[in-house]
Amino acid sequence: MSAQQVRRSLTPYGQENGAPKDQAIQGIESPAPQVDRGDDSRKETALKQVSTRTLYSYQQRAATFFYERDAAFLVAPLGAGKGAAALTALADLVRDGHRRHALVIAPKLVAATVWPLEVTLWPHLAHLRVAVLNGAPERRRALLARAGEREVTAIGVDLVPWLVGELAGLEPDHPLFDVLIIDEKSRLKDPYGKRARALLRIAGRFRSRWGLTGTPRPNSSMDLFMPAAVITDGALWGRAFVPWQRRHFRPRDPFGREWVAFPGAEAKITASFGTVAMTVADEDMPDLPPLNVVETHLQLPDPVMASYRAMARKLFTTAEGRTIAAASPLIATGKLAQMANGFLYGAGNDDAVFVHDLKIEWLKELVESLDGEPLLIAYEFIEDLRTIRRALGQVPALGGSTTAREALPLIEEWNEGALPLLAFHPAAAGHGLNLQHGGSRMAWLSPSWSAELTQQAIARIYRPGQTRHVTVHVCIATGTVDEMKRDRVLGKMSAQEAFRRHLEQI
């Protein structure tokens, strides 16, 4: 069947059992998970929020959209429940005999924690069996061999090159080639990345391909090409990036580091992408409590700023009696971010030189003022996490090296209100995780360079199910790259442009 061919209209779940149509559209009450309630009122709140979870009308429309199309994107605000919509469509396709299985590619922790939990939150999805493809290669191969025994197999995006190698030898009618679901397609936006290029080689073997995203074009419309190539198998814009890029963009500099769209190109690309995408508007989303971002600006001591300016202008500086140099302006940008946070890496990540303690003192005061209210702490560098733990004790963390086995209990404890503090790295735990039941405050020791990571990270607590006023605290060192990072997030400057402007100002 073609991507636009309709198989049949989707029967709303509950209707086939005699339930009225409006019940199926407005939502289905989900049973509460078995959680030790304890005496903490936050646990009671989290349990109540889960037990009254419903399927919204826009999710039902999205499920219909997927059911009727073999190549489709769902663009919806962060926290909109895109996974539930995709699984609803899959469940109906399986029930009607059109499909047997879905292969889900998602950020590592999301694949291991969110997708297995999702099917337990909805009665009409409870029959779906989910396996997580992780661990040693032997274990992963054993699970792949048994894919026909379940409806969903989830795998982290970091394992895509390995996965493609394993799938290459399978028969065309293998269940693993029924439905491909890419959760947060921005992880595959790099046209030169190994993951996206590997997946593109076998994209056409999947009968259905669906993409889910809350940030469709995190930096520019060029970010749309590779996901569109995979989901449509090149039918939308082709499979070769460079010719498409040169038709719609021109280089801003002689080296092609930055590109700008030709007049009218952005609108043309957006309209074309809209032919294969369903978009959920913000007004379709359930009402969320207020969101407040509080910036705290710290003035670094004069000696620290003098050392900072030396690194910016000369690419070397002195700290704690040591001379530390940067090999290039781009590397110096990272060094300046470290200095703004309070340290400098010397020979490596295990060799940190003290610069100042203003930011960690700010964090300590914030934690004390919250008087036990749960706080998520976003950190950028490993040394940031070490500093946090030296100041506040052995704070648990979701980072790049966190395994699924380690992450699951931390997420459960947080959502039960049992963790007063939880640190996380936005690149490792900023996508897809549901952390809204455990708290409503977040602290950033420094802004992120990435608008997408910032938006995704905040959406871990600012999403449907959150009932409290959400406050995001951001610490900014005045006159440093912290300000450039914030401006880049707001204005979409490149790292090179931000550094150039910063040099002009100091």
Task: Report each predicted region and the residues it spans.
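A conserved SF2-helicase RecA2
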Residues: W449-I458, Y462-I506
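Conserved pre-motif I regulatory segment
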Residues: R42-V75
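Interdomain linker/hinge connecting the two RecA-like lobes of the SF2 helicase core
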Residues: D70-F73, P77, K185, P191-Y192, ...
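Conserved P-loop NTPase motor "coupling/switch" region that bridges the ATPase
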Residues: H101, H127-V130, G148, V179, ...
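SF2 helicase motor core recognition
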Residues: P161-V164, N219-S221, L385-R386, L422-S446, ...
